[in-house]
């Protein structure tokens, strides 16, 4: 049940680009991280360039394009190799959608303890406990 937020700034994304980010991110989570596509959520948000700064300077007026992808997964469910591959693949995907992407763009994988987030009202720890008991 991964949740991925992709924030972009410096270029307004059209519906096709947003759909590409939704579909490709979901596919990468399945192929690279082994996550179920049907429970992978992706939120794409656009931040005004005046709200985003790099080096203390607002992106507005600089012509720069940047992004931040925050991938939330359950702690301990992926290896360091899988996470490194996902970070690289996500960066490549962002470059395909945003060819002028700055090097100052980030992909972060947050590992959330199974006791600290839920899907369908049950924590991941409780889901595992119930599955193990069945």
Please name every model-derived segment.
Residues 1-134:
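A domain-level signal for the structural core that forms small-molecule/cofactor-binding pockets
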